[in-house]
Every structure is written in C-alpha cells, then in structure tokens.
C-alpha cells in the first residue's frame, strides 16, 4: 500500500539507481527528497554526508514510485535487490513467492531469506538461506509454475539452523550476507 503523499514543504524525485538520472515519478526507482525537515548532514563526517546526498537531495535507499494522485509506494530497499544480467531482482518479492508457492508459515520467525552474492558472469547470483529442507530442483519447479522468471530463481540453497535476525526482529542483513557467502565457499 501507499505510505501517503509528501508533507507540505517537501519535494521528491525518482531516480534510476544506476545512472542517478531522474525518471518519471510513476516508474520504480530510487526515492530522494529534500525539504526544511531534512537534516543537513552527519556531524563531523563529511564523507558519510557526501554519500547520503545527491546534488542536495537526501538519498533514502528506498525503491518506490508515485501514482497519478501523488501517493508514494515503497517497493523495497535498494540493498534488498540484486542486479543480475542488468536486471534489478527484488529479494523480498522472491521470498514472498517462495513462501506462497510452498505455503510456508513464518508466524514463528523467518524460515528463509534470499541474498545476492558476487558472480563474475552475471554480476550477482541469488542464494536462498532456509531452515527448511528444500532442493534446487523443487524450488525451480515451484517458482517456474508460479510464472517467476528463471533469472529470479536462486541457484544455491543453504540450509541453516536459524535465519540471522537482529534484536528488533528484522533480518540481520550482514549475518545473512555472511552466511550466503559461506554457502558459496563450502
């Protein structure tokens, strides 16, 4: 759903995350904004400030789009996408497709996480971390039956005792990334 419209005094733009060029607001891209309520930078940390802004606009790290009525829809975090063969592949969407296809229950906590790891041929490759027993063949079959593009099907599955989470209950992206990297090394 929508997170609403921009507050009065705020301006936003949608950028192509690769080129940082402005694209139509109704296309999915990197959300940036500026306004009187946006901070000016990190205290005594000009390098971090430089990375957080683009030409005076704050870089949210969110991928989103606006509808015709000006409502903003956040569709993911840039850090939760992989670029594979030039295409942006959303980890959260793949995770939800796997949960739906296999009718997995995550009411007691995470049972899976999709992560991107470097791949010399395609840029990145997808690794599925899961607490459940699942084969690549089963995964591929179910996702293709659900009309998920082949490019979005994780090629590596790593069974883990638990999906790394933070004290807040959110995915520990660093822990998941480390586990995904380790899966390729083993």
Regions of interest found by a model, annotated:
Residues 1-69, 78-81, 94-97:
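Conserved AMP-binding/adenylate-forming
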Residues 12, 111-114, 156-157:
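Generic structural signal for residues in well-ordered beta-strands
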Residues 17-19, 68, 121, 161, ...:
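Short, ordered coil/turn segments that flank beta-strands lining enzyme active or ligand-binding pockets
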Residues 22-24, 67, 73, 166, ...:
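Generic structural signal for well-ordered beta-strand positions
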Residues 23-27, 76, 123-124, 170:
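Short glycine/proline-enriched turns and hinge-like loops at secondary-structure junctions
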Residues 35, 40-41, 63-152, 175-178:
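AMP-binding/adenylate-forming catalytic core of the ANL superfamily
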Residues 124, 148-171:
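AMP-binding/adenylate-forming catalytic domain of the ANL superfamily
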Residues 170-186:
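Phosphopantetheine-dependent thiolation modules in NRPS/PKS and related acyl-activating systems
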């Amino acid at each position: 759903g929508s997170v609403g419209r921009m507050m009065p005094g705020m301006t936003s733009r949608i950028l192509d995350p690769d080129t940082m060029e402005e694209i139509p607001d109704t296309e999915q891209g990197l959300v940036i904004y500026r306004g009187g309520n946006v901070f000016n930078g990190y205290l005594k940390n000009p390098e971090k400030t430089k990375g957080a802004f683009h030409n005076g606009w704050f870089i949210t790290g969110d991928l989103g789009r606006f509808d015709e009525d000006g409502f903003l829809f956040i569709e993911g975090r840039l850090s939760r996408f992989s670029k594979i063969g030039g295409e942006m592949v959303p980890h959260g969407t793949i995770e939800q497709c796997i949960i739906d296809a296999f009718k997995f229950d995550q009411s007691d906590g995470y049972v899976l996480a999709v992560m991107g790891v470097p791949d010399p041929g395609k840029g990145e490759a997808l690794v599925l971390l899961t607490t459940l027993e699942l084969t690549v063949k089963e995964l591929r079959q179910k996702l293709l039956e659900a009309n998920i593009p082949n490019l979005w099907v994780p090629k590596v599955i790593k069974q883990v005792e638990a999906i790394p989470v933070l004290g807040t209950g959110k995915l520990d992206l660093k822990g998941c990334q480390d586990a995904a990297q380790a899966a390729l090394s083993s």
